[in-house]
Amino acid sequence: MTNSSKIRIALLVLVVLVLGLVSIFGDQYTKLVLMLAFLYMALGQFWNLLGGYAGLVSLGQQIFIGLGGYTLAVTVLYYGFPIWLGVLTGGVIALFFALVISPAIFRMSGVYFSIGTWVVAESLAIWFSNWEYVEMGQGLFIRPAKQLSVSQLYYLAMLVAVGSVALVYGVMRSKLGLALMAMRNDPGASETCGVSVFRNKLYCYLISSFCTGITAGVLYLNMVFIQPYKAFGIDWTVALLFIVIIGGIGTIEGPIIGAVIYVLLQQYLSDYASVSMLVLGVVAIIIMLIVPKGIMGTIQEKLGFEILSPRRHL
């Protein structure tokens, strides 16, 4: 291990320790804001794994957010599951649903894949809005979530965020990661060299869906209430696109930077809900004009600086 690698690891550990101390010394508002940043960071990492590395630009990531949230609500309310098991079950249900729809949506590519995932999400929103079992469009209160303190939720969200970064880094340093980067650069050539494009994209899609479902469960522990058109709404994907694009698509650090910017803007614009999406759109356009590869992508290109590089150096 080089000295620069040791310094980077030490800095990362220091950042995690400082964030951990916020739960002890920070006020409740700071903890709630950081909690949101952690969870959006994780959701951004898992979308980036699809769109940034595998080339699967999904407009339906809210499929797994909604399934994760509703599974948590149903299992803890109707069946008395422990909260941790409800969250884990949400990930399993999301993974199973991804496995079911993948043969159909993987027949599409490019913009058709994007539209196909969005159509599935909209279909689920309509179904859940008319399903009496989940109180239709009225939604469900996740009452057992109130048993958890803000500090407990904070540490749980922080664990999810750190886990998401570690997982994506590990995936991209594995054989699957090498295959994904080869496929992103030239799918035809990589398949000619023996890389199974379908299998590797499927693995990536399943990993992303499972982890998104779990993250959504933790998110809805904080939100307490879930409704179909919110849970399966396109607003989730708009937020994730904003986070990943301005932070730097195809970089591990990008969603971290993007999530912090998004949550801070969201808090600042909370009193201006009617124009918040417009402002976010303008900010995204300005950043894309100034730094087309996103903040971290441009830093890497201009300065060659990376904290968590998935590339292997020979």
Predicted regions and their residues:
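Transmembrane alpha-helices and adjacent helix-loop boundaries
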Residues: 1-314
